[in-house]
């Protein structure tokens, strides 16, 4: 699934939050978005997800769906989550996210706590998401088993409302719910925030594996340069809403470039 950004601009008062003339995120990329506070990372994600309206420009999702399926039905799902259906001939589509909601069927995201239904327990929330995606109880349990180390015995079966959880555990619930949608586009804003080192390493492994298994397009923003370099095939550096650097990181060559950019002079 490609994400194609053209002439995208968003201002708040006299401040330009995003100003991107042309950016294409290619199908199957695991793209890391980095930049200082106020660089426009979260605003860009909100524009892609149509949570806020752009002043000018478009965000489009382009890909293919199987003949006879709805626009939002997925072509691939992760191993051990859902069985793959026979794949008829693909039909191409090109959707403007601001003018249709079809893209939401294959898009998972966690941007902040407002995405959660906090009067539910984690178990209830996952069951709710499972019903939305026609995921059986057996398939849900298989999904949760893949996240057992990530949950660290603090979420499943605990009967605690999401609103009472720590910031780190809320983060875990949001990430897992986004991935439970079996998305072909996955967008996570600061997924390493509030997580302990074990959980950070676990989610790095899970994201890389999900990308490899499904070919999903994954966008991750983070202030943690090391984690971003570890998982991303491509890294985009934003500053004042503009793309300053666009780095091929398939050989992890972005580390030195980013360290030099963010270096503090003595």
Name each model-derived stretch.
Residues 34-36:
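The feature captures the beta-strand-to-loop junction immediately N-terminal to the Walker
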Residues 49:
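Helix-to-loop junction immediately C-terminal to a conserved catalytic motif
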Residues 161-165:
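Conserved ABC ATPase signature
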Residues 186-190:
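Catalytic Walker B motif of ABC-type/P-loop ATPase nucleotide-binding domains
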Residues 197-199:
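Helix N-cap at the start of a conserved alpha-helix in ABC-type nucleotide-binding domains
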Residues 221-223:
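H-loop/switch region of ABC-family ATPase nucleotide-binding domains
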């Amino acid at each position: 699934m490609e994400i194609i950004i053209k002439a995208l601009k968003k201002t708040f008062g006299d401040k330009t939050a995003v100003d991107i003339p042309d950016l294409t995120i290619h199908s199957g990329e695991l793209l890391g978005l980095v930049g200082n506070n106020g660089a426009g990372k979260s605003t860009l994600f909100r524009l892609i997800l149509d949570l806020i309206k752009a002043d000018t420009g478009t965000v489009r999702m382009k890909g293919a769906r199987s003949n006879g399926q709805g626009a939002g039905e997925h072509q691939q799902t992760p191993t051990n989550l859902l069985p793959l259906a026979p794949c008829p001939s693909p039909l191409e589509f090109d959707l403007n996210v601001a003018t249709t909601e079809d893209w939401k069927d294959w898009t998972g995201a966690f941007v902040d706590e407002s995405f959660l239904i906090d009067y539910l327990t984690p178990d209830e929330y996952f069951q709710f998401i499972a019903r939305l995606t026609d995921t059986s109880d057996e398939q849900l349990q298989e999904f949760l088993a893949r996240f057992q180390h990530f949950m660290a015995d603090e979420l499943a079966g605990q009967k605690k409302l999401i609103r009472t959880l720590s910031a780190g555990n809320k983060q875990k619930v949001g990430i897992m719910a986004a991935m439970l949608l079996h998305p072909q586009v996955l967008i996570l804003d600061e997924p390493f925030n509030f997580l302990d080192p074990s959980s950070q390493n676990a989610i790095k492994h899970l994201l890389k594996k999900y990308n490899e298994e499904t070919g999903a397009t994954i966008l991750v923003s983070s202030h943690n340069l090391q984690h971003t370099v570890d998982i991303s095939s491509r890294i985009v550096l934003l500053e004042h809403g503009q793309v300053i650097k666009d780095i091929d990181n398939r050989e992890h060559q972005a580390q030195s470039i980013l360290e030099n950019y963010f270096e503090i002079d003595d």
